[in-house]
């Protein structure tokens, strides 16, 4: 195995996180927040994974571009990511869309979200730029990708996942040679090209790019001058470099961080209600696919000060209990029973209620005798006494956002419309 350099390249890199997207496939879950600000795993927000990867990789200069409904995201970062110190040559910049180029122009694409802050990037004088999406769940050491970028002499190095070929139709797909040099980049192809050594698999873009800073800024300026550009990395910047420069694929398996319990590289988009529910519920397994308890690669986040979780009542039909579940601080399970559920902070589950396959966001109150199965309940929802979800598909679909696989998203406006 190749060893890391004695002098890490991450020390001379800046991570630039694109966190302005809505995530419309999450429906009402992103009505009040951007997708990167959506809660995940009982404690964190989705963006904490990209930020933690950067920090754990040794990167100490980070910029985060925000746009859509950014208040909760900005507040979270101000509270949880305020420990960077300029006197140690560290920085953490929150970069909201602010019409820095013209009085009528917000961020018009992923590339434009970087271009509009070129002066800030130049001020830091870093050698390398690591462009990241702020809405994926994974653990990755970017130092390995930086090292491959330098060793290969590439103009851009693109993080890629190996996925079954016919599942790659929703991704940007790399056609590579046996050296993983990218010959073509195809956006959402009907017939994805296979990998030379694994023809039944394709290399799908993770939306992670490494550049030498000067090359990137020159490419952004050239793109900004093109009136036909959509100002997007995947649609404009990357295809141009593939055709006119040298682009190299970096396989995620080479830099994925895995504990002793994680056997396969883990990366999730969690961009749909089903995917979001499944990724959270997976954490309740005895040996989950994603190890969030790995102290060698912590997921940093805002550490809210809360009292411990509490379980009360021990009668035959009224026992506060949880099996195969994750329960966060400040939760009180008062005579309720949980199975295969994940609760964020401040949840109150009252007597005789039963939760199974439930993802409960912070500060939810669950009334007595509620029966909730396969649900995602948004922040602060008050579940009325006796509400039953998960038994009558037709009724659930009328009341809530129900997916084809039977997962129900419940928000307070939906509850307010109930006639019960």
Swiss-Prot record:
Xref: SUPFAM superfamilies: Nucleotide-diphospho-sugar transferases, Trimeric LpxA-like enzymes
Coiled-coil zones: none
* Highest taxon listed in the record's lineage: Bacteria
Q: Where is the signal peptide?
A: none
Q: Which residues bind alpha-D-glucose 1-phosphate?
A: 107, 172, 187-188, 205
Q: Output one GO BP term.
A: glycogen biosynthetic process
Q: Which GO terms describe its molecular function?
A: ATP binding; glucose-1-phosphate adenylyltransferase activity
Q: In which pathway does it act?
A: Glycan biosynthesis; glycogen biosynthesis
Q: Which Pfam families match?
A: Hexapep_GlmU (PF24894), NTP_transferase (PF00483)
| CDD domains tied to this protein | ADP_Glucose_PP, LbH_G1P_AT_C
According to its UniProt record, the EC number is 2.7.7.27
EC class of the enzyme, as a word: transferase
Q: Which UniProt keywords apply?
A: ATP-binding, Carbohydrate metabolism, Glycogen biosynthesis, Glycogen metabolism, Nucleotide-binding, Nucleotidyltransferase, Transferase
The catalysed reaction is: alpha-D-glucose 1-phosphate + ATP + H(+) = ADP-alpha-D-glucose + diphosphate
As for family, the record states: Belongs to the bacterial/plant glucose-1-phosphate adenylyltransferase family.
Summarize the protein's role: Involved in the biosynthesis of ADP-glucose, a building block required for the elongation reactions to produce glycogen. Catalyzes the reaction between ATP and alpha-D-glucose 1-phosphate (G1P) to produce pyrophosphate and ADP-Glc.
* Complex and partners: Homotetramer.
Identification of the protein by name: Glucose-1-phosphate adenylyltransferase
Organism per entry: Rhizobium etli (strain CIAT 652)
